[in-house]
Amino acid sequence: GLGDVYKRQNHRRFASAFGSMQTHPAYPTVEGFPEITILENDEENPSKIEEWHTDMTFKKNPPLGSILIGKIIPENGGDTMFSSLSKAYDDLSQEWKERLEEMNAIHSFEFGFKESLEEEGGRERLADALKENPPVSHPVIKQHPVTGRKVIYVNRLFTSHIEEDDSKNSILSFLFEHIHQEKFQYRFSWENNSIAFWDNRSV
């Protein structure tokens, strides 16, 4: 109805205040609002992104942030967990900080969406997304453009390997375990129409 359209217009208007919006290449969108992605997680449409991740790092210029509105909330569970990549960096030893400073990691759409691509018709459905999103390289250690704090910029879902690491991804495995420590985490519990806005450059 008109009420829903108005809410979506406000969603888009709010997001546009922080910069240009990006469309997601793999998920369905709201009719008339290509920037608004539909995320479902139920028995008919189970989530395929249960891994820790930073949104859309397979892009050369990933989005600044993501704004999610909770529309249908389960009675139990469904919380969203965030992990601070700046706190994780601060907790590294000086030796690790220096070692990682010169490293770069490959982030890949194909790697992150391998489950969807393996589904019947998946590779055909996502053919354009695959073509438009070849693997990209990002520094393992990035500096936040606003706060100046350094972050560990790798994630389980999209980071396939570190370019300079030939030890069977042992460095990447170490970083994943390090980042996901409970002391760096924040738990967000949803209610109907809750809004979560997070900084993709640091979580």
Where do the language-model regions lie?
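Short, small-residue-biased leader/transition segments that mark boundaries at the very start
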Residues: L2-Y6
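Glycine-rich, N-terminal phosphate-binding loop and its surrounding beta-alpha-beta segment
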Residues: H24
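Active-site environment of non-heme Fe oxygenases that use a 2-His-1-carboxylate facial triad
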Residues: Y27-Q185, F197, R201-V203
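Glycine-rich loop at the start of a catalytic domain that most often binds anionic cofactors/ligands
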Residues: Q9-M21
